[in-house]
Amino acid sequence: MEPYYTIMRLPGETREEFILLLPFTPSRRDNMIAWLAARSDLPHYGKLLLFDFPKGKLVFGPRQIEARIDQDAFISQQITLWSQAGSQVIRGGLLAIPIEESLLYVQPLYLAAERGRMPELKRVITAFGNRIAMEETLEASLQQIFGGRPAQPDAAPRPAVAKAEPAQR
């Protein structure tokens, strides 16, 4: 998985910041063991923080999540159906978002028509722990994963808060 930039609140911090996030999987293994945050805001510019997941906790890695998406009967059937209709299914970049002592994975699916039109967002896939969902919007996909009711329209969105312990090095 390639590193990517995001805005999030790091564990122990009071405000969000712009970071470069890199998830880590062990050599020849597929599970996730840690993630690294490279801070980009002052006064912490250039500082690196490594967050290890607890040793006894299994956190799925990107390859495991991709395999689970491919093996999901409903998702696989939909992708096959869209591909046969003369369109191309484009899988967007898989994002790993730290939440508590685990990861939320988010991957958009785009559909590009044969006639060269710009791809349109068709579905959003989310995965957390053993749960996986594919819905028309991110909000609906998150509701499938976490349950609950939709947020009120006037409610301001709240960023995810990562919770993990920095590694002692």
Give short role names for the model-derived ranges.
Residues M1-R169:
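Accessory, solvent-exposed terminal regions and/or long lumenal/extracellular loops of proteins
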